[in-house]
């Protein structure tokens, strides 16, 4: 499941684990979330291209864009996240969850980390 995700722990509620899959051409990481773990709302920014793609590989999780209903992620589910979209993703309350995260190449790409997903918001899932 990778190593404890200490470098990004301040952007997560709960414990997550990170395993690098590739750093050539496209950055790909396997991210594993314990039950109820989720990352903060965030935005992948780029002046051209950019964004992220998630592929569920184990367990059950959630993806949500601001202002839209949450989408369940199961093994094989593919989520395309365009640059500039505020969103979060993480595990279901009753399941460990893992996804592959692909960083879509872009110009001047960066992440803007925002507020945590509150327990009140999360518990509505």
Predicted stretch roles:
Residues 1-29, 40, 110-125:
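A short, N-terminal "cap"/entry segment at the start of jelly-roll beta-barrel domains
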Residues 16, 20, 34-55:
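Catalytic core of non-heme Fe(II) oxygenases with the double-stranded beta-helix
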Residues 18-20, 28-32, 53, 70, ...:
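Conserved hydrophobic/aromatic beta-strand scaffold that supports enzyme active sites
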Residues 24, 34-36, 56, 66, ...:
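A short, compositionally biased micro-patch
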Residues 24-26, 34-38, 60, 107-108:
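Short, charged/polar surface micro-motifs in flexible loops or helix N-caps
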Residues 38, 48-75, 85:
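A short beta-strand-loop-beta hairpin characteristic of the jelly-roll/cupin
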Residues 62, 74, 83-111:
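Ligand-binding loop in jelly-roll beta-barrel domains
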């Amino acid at each position: 499941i990778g190593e404890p995700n200490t470098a990004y722990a301040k952007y997560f509620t709960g414990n997550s684990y990170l395993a690098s899959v590739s750093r050539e051409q496209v950055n790909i990481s396997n991210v594993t979330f314990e039950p109820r773990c989720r990352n903060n709302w965030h935005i992948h920014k780029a002046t051209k291209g950019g964004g992220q793609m998630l592929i569920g590989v184990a367990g059950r999780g959630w993806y949500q864009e601001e202002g839209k209903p949450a989408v369940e992620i199961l093994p094989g589910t593919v989520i395309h996240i365009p640059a500039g979209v505020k969103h979060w993703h993480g595990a279901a309350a009753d399941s460990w969850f893992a996804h592959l995260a692909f960083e879509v190449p872009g110009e001047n790409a960066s992440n803007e980390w925002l507020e945590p997903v509150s327990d009140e918001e999360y518990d509505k899932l």
